[in-house]
């Protein structure tokens, strides 16, 4: 895209899955030119991730070949930033580490995305989102009081504490590079990012307002006024009536204003009884019946929508929170919104290697015959 607040910024993304390409998507959505380096063996294949890989170019280059690595160094030398998601030490072995690249391009911002970080006892260990949020302390907080921890998809480690944090770090370092002329390395670890997302929880813990066990606290489903309830049709509503005025509205709609069990909202000794009664009441109507009953009542009660339902909700539809992707299904629209520099529509995720010739011709200065020779050698795709 040419529009957006990051228009004019060029970023090279070194392959990868999950948080690193999510970071690339965020920056591409906001107008940055993102060039993704893929493996030549995948050349011509449809994008494996049609949403998260939208909005960028794809060049297919063999990073394990010295000529291929040299080509990528040339691209990065003409770029503002790089996104790298390998295990610590891999980029260095490929000749694509920050020392080499910053020596050639001192203003470069080098973003590193890992689970454990570049150092520490676990730095070389494999892992996934569930492992990172487990060690960071977040997974322990999620799930019922009488059950096991429940992983929140890979939203917390990979995306909230990973790719999104790296995007913030890259933009911050790019701003510094613009004003100082000095680049730097951004070490984004999913364990660090997940810990950061727990800032308010640790604040509650420090003040004695949080028990270090799940399902018994105000924000983890322990409170009857901040929980999910099953309805008559086996669908659910989410109740978030924390503040007194919202709690009062909840009781009013449910005809519980005069029920003594609900007179003291924060009496934890009574929470179990309150929760049982709310569960009984919500089970008497369907989800959509409750949604209509609470519409406009200011009680902070919402229907729990499925992935297919959410794009069709009137609010999401009015704000174009979701868009119809080129793959034919819904996908999230770029966010946040900008008044002066609104981004354009994201381009479809390219086939692997779709832009190899154009990028290498334009940025690396190669002639078409040179590129054909590299293809014959398997160095590019």
Label the model's feature ranges.
Residues 2, 26, 30, 92-237, ...:
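Active-site-adjacent "lid/gating" segments in soluble enzymes
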Residues 2, 325-373:
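Flexible, small-/acidic-enriched active-site or ligand-binding loops
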Residues 16, 63, 87-88, 114-115, ...:
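Short glycine-/small-residue-rich Rossmann-like dinucleotide-binding loops
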Residues 225-297, 301:
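Aromatic-enriched alpha-helical interface/lid elements that frame and gate functional surfaces
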Residues 12, 52-104:
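A structured beta-alpha segment of the ubiquitous adenosine-cofactor-binding alpha/beta core
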Residues 3-42:
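Conserved small-residue-rich beta-alpha loop and adjacent elements
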Residues 295-346:
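A glycine-rich dinucleotide-binding beta-alpha-beta segment and adjacent secondary-structure elements
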């Amino acid at each position: 895209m040419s529009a957006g607040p990051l228009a004019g910024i060029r970023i090279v993304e070194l392959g990868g899955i999950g948080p690193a390409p999510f970071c690339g998507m965020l920056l591409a959505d906001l107008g940055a030119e993102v060039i993704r380096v893929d493996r030549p063996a995948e050349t011509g294949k449809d994008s494996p991730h049609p949403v998260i890989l939208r909005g960028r170019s794809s060049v297919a280059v063999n990073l394990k070949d010295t000529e291929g690595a040299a080509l990528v160094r040339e691209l990065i030398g003409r770029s503002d930033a790089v996104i790298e998601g390998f295990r610590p030490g891999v980029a260095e072995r490929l000749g694509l580490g920050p020392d080499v690249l910053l020596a050639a391009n001192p203003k470069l911002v080098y973003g590193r995305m890992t689970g454990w970080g570049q150092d520490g006892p676990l730095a070389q260990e494999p892992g996934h989102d569930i492992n990172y949020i487990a060690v960071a302390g977040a997974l322990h907080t999620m799930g019922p009081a009488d059950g096991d921890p429940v992983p929140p998809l890979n939203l917390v480690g990979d995306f909230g504490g990973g790719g999104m944090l790296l995007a913030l770090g890259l933009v911050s370092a790019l701003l510094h590079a613009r004003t100082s002329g000095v680049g730097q390395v951004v070490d984004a670890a999913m364990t660090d990012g997940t810990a950061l997302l727990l800032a308010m929880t640790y604040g509650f813990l420090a003040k004695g307002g949080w028990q270090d066990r799940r399902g018994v606290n105000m924000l983890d489903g322990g409170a009857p006024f901040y929980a999910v309830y099953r309805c008559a049709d086996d669908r659910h509503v989410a109740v978030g009536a924390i503040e007194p005025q919202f709690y009062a509205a909840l009781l009013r709609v449910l005809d519980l204003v005069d029920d003594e069990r609900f007179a003291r909202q924060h009496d934890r000794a009574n929470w179990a009884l309150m929760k049982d009664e709310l569960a009984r009441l919500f089970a008497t109507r369907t989800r959509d019946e409750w949604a209509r009953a609470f519409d406009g009542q200011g009680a902070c009660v919402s229907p729990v929508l499925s992935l297919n339902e959410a794009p069709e909700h009137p609010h999401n539809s009015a704000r174009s929170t979701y868009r119809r992707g080129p793959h034919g299904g819904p996908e999230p629209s770029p966010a946040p919104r900008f008044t002066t520099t609104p981004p354009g529509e994201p381009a479809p995720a390219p086939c692997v290697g779709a832009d190899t010739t154009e990028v290498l011709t334009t940025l690396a200065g190669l002639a078409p015959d040179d590129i054909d020779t590299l293809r014959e050698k398997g160095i590019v795709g």
